[in-house]
């Protein structure tokens, strides 16, 4: 063999193996990157020893798709429907929003009989914009740059794209998308993500506002789809410059997207209800007063790497803040002030519309020992079949200085069967005193049922529940209520003396405080409905850590007290495995080991 051929053979051999090694290195790099990205989660899940997966279970993807579509069909929430904008029986529509870049929603809409603007679809598919683009940080799955909304600016819409609107103008469907998951705090300062410092991630950015304004100019019907698992700020929904006729919410449905098309067409009548309170300004929440990345500092003033914050809003999160402060404003108590509920809340917890109408009657509430059974008759009084949801709320008596209580708490709910026009169904629920008890951490140090007047009400949402209770107390719109309540949907139950629920219903074990020393900052001021003005005066400055030099740090007033981490506390932070829970009970002491299935030799403690 000539030297030239030998050289060529060696060269070819080298090229092939170089490519193989390069591909292997690339694959290892990707896997290593993902492992590093989820390092904390993987370590917690798998531990620090090897785990062998011996499962041979397979799953039917068709079954998965059916379940996903069922979840969306039952859970998507119709928030607004002016002039019966929905449903639409087919039609020629234009689909807006960078979240449509994949073409998935377009396909299911076309499968449902809609004709979707192809020029606009091609424009998004070719766009360089992509929502959520950014870099990732290692360790805990957090995204440091993934909050770029990146909607297409109006300056990039060509004349041909805009000209296509007139041929597909039965409706404009605008998709607004937000991401977010565990391990990620959504930014309330968008200056690092293409926005401004006074914008938060869950409000519309400049490009989205301009998109809605331009769409309103070109279309008589505007439908907004909100694809977000987090509660977006809803200050835009009723603004005249956007002309929004209908709003449908769904939470990143993945394989269930087909049900969205069926809801728009009317093949499915929406029956979902909100599991959050949607407000005009997300900063109105009590929990936002100290939201941030609060870090402990070492004795030398450097950051320790550990974060901590006392949740001094206490129970007043979501509807338990908004509805409770509203009731106190109506009752003129607790320094609630001139609280304007209507200007604060766009859609209350439990809210949701239907394409038909329902009428409720004959509420019955019966107590049998520790169990309560509540029932009501639901009748479809509209012109199309649909399902309704009856939510049962409870109000427990509040004693200033005692256990904090929300104005109402959801006790149970039930969804009807598919009811044809004119059809009725009697629905009922059962709940126990344990389900509605409060925990008295200071005095009784166990669950309690306080003496006084209790109310059970059937309502469409949390706000209607409060109004029903207020009506039962003799209050009307003349007292500042947003609407008159329905006394027929509220029942009073009087407890003569306080009851302690200090025995576990299953094990019989004593129920009492276990973590009295878990709060590190003893000077924490907790929010109380006895004095709402504390929050208004930025009184909830209760975060530990430093407020300067760390991204997204600071409360409403821009500062926070600083605490130095102790050696003892640092040691607790550095614990691993079961010890890291600081659980004072050894898992082997569980009263009934059969209740705690575990692959190891010790029973796993209940969560």
Residue ranges, per PLM feature:
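C-terminal non-catalytic regions of proteins with extracellular/luminal or membrane-system context
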Residues: 1-607
């Amino acid at each position: 063999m000539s030297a030239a051929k030998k050289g060529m053979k060696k060269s070819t051999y080298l090229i092939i193996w170089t490519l193989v090694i390069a591909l292997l290195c690339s694959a290892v790099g990707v896997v290593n990157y993902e492992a590093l990205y989820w390092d904390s989660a993987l370590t917690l899940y798998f531990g620090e020893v090897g785990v062998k997966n011996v499962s041979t279970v397979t799953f039917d993807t068709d079954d998965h798709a059916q379940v996903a579509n069922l979840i969306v069909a039952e859970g998507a929430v119709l928030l607004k429907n002016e002039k019966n904008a929905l449903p639409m029986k087919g039609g020629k529509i234009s689909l807006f929003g960078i979240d449509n870049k994949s073409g998935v929603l377009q396909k299911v809409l076309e499968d449902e009989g809609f004709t979707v603007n192809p020029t606009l679809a091609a424009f998004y598919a070719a766009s360089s914009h992509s929502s959520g683009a950014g870099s990732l940080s290692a360790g805990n799955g957090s995204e440091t740059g993934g909050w770029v909304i990146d909607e297409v600016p109006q300056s990039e819409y060509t004349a041909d794209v805009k000209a296509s609107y007139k041929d597909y103008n039965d409706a404009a469907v605008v998709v607004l998308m937000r991401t977010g998951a565990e391990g990620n705090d959504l930014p309330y300062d968008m200056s690092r993500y293409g926005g401004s410092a006074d914008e938060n991630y869950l409000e519309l950015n400049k490009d989205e506002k301009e998109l809605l304004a331009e769409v309103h100019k070109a279309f008589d019907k505007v439908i907004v789809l909100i694809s977000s698992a987090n509660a977006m700020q809803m200050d835009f929904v009723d603004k005249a410059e956007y002309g929004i006729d209908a709003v449908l919410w769904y939470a990143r449905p993945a394989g269930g997207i087909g049900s969205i098309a069926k809801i728009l067409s009317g093949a499915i009548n929406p029956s979902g209800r909100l599991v959050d309170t949607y407000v005009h300004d997300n900063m109105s929440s009590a929990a936002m007063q100290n939201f941030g990345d609060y870090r402990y500092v070492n004795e030398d003033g450097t950051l320790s790497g550990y974060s901590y914050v006392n949740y001094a809003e206490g129970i007043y999160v979501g509807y338990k803040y908004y509805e409770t402060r509203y009731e106190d404003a109506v009752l003129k108590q607790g320094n609630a002030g001139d609280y304007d509920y209507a200007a604060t809340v766009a859609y209350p917890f439990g809210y949701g519309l239907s394409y038909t109408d329902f009428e409720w009657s004959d509420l019955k509430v019966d107590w049998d020992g520790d169990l309560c059974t509540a029932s009501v008759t639901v009748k479809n009084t509209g012109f199309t079949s649909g399902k309704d949801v009856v939510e049962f709320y409870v109000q427990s008596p509040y004693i200033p200085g005692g256990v904090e209580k929300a104005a109402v708490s959801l006790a149970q709910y039930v969804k009807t069967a598919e009811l044809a026009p004119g059809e009725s169904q009697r629905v009922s629920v059962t709940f126990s005193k344990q389900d509605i008890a409060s925990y008295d951490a200071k005095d009784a140090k166990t669950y309690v049922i306080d003496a006084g007047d209790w109310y059970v009400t059937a309502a469409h949402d949390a706000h209607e529940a409060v109004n029903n209770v207020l009506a039962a107390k003799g209050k009307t719109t003349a007292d500042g209520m947003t609407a008159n309540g329905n006394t027929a949907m509220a029942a009073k139950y009087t407890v003569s003396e306080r009851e302690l629920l200090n025995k576990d219903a299953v094990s019989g074990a004593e129920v009492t405080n276990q973590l009295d020393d878990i709060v590190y900052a003893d000077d924490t001021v907790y929010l109380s409905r006895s004095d709402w003005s504390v929050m208004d005066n930025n009184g909830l400055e209760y975060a530990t850590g430093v407020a300067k030099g760390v991204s997204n740090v600071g409360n409403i007033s821009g500062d926070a007290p600083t605490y130095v981490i102790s050696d003892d506390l640092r040691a607790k932070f550095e614990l691993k495995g079961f010890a890291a829970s600081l659980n004072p009970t050894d898992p082997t002491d569980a009263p009934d080991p059969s209740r705690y299935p575990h692959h190891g030799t010790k029973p796993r403690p209940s969560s």
